């Protein structure tokens, strides 16, 4: 009974810098983060989608990133015990990808918040949340 990390890939990333953003202004960033876990024979697929779009308040950029982590599991394994570990393994890569996207736009890198996957996911196979984050200035 083991979960083995195979790889991680960014399947899609879209980043748009908002024109005419005000310098030295605080922006309240509320990303929508979803995690979907599914099993295919001897694989566990962990897909994260992170979205940030304009809502009621202006923000300096919009993005959508889809990242997939692939794990190997034994055919007889009950993967419900692996869901938290899989999400905990992939999420740091997702955080780094988002930070790198913002850094390449020549703005301060945006770090997604830390998330306690055990609290959020538990044994669920699909979770979506909006995470309040510190203001970005």
Residue ranges with predicted function:
Residues 1-89, 96-137:
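N-terminal intrinsically disordered, cationic/polar leader segments
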């Amino acid at each position: 009974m083991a979960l083995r990390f195979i790889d991680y890939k960014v399947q899609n990333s879209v980043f748009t810098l908002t024109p005419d953003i005000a310098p030295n202004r605080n922006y309240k960033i509320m990303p929508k983060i979803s995690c979907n876990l599914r099993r295919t024979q001897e694989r566990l697929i962990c897909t994260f989608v992170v979205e940030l779009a304009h809502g009621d308040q202006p923000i300096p950029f919009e993005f959508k990133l889809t990242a997939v982590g692939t794990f190997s599991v034994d055919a007889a394994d009950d993967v419900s015990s692996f869901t938290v570990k899989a999400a905990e393994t992939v999420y740091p890569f997702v955080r780094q990808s988002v930070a790198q996207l913002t850094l390449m736009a020549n703005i301060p890198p945006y770090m997604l918040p830390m998330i306690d996957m055990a609290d959020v996911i538990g044994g669920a196979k699909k979770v979506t949340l909006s995470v309040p984050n510190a203001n970005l200035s």
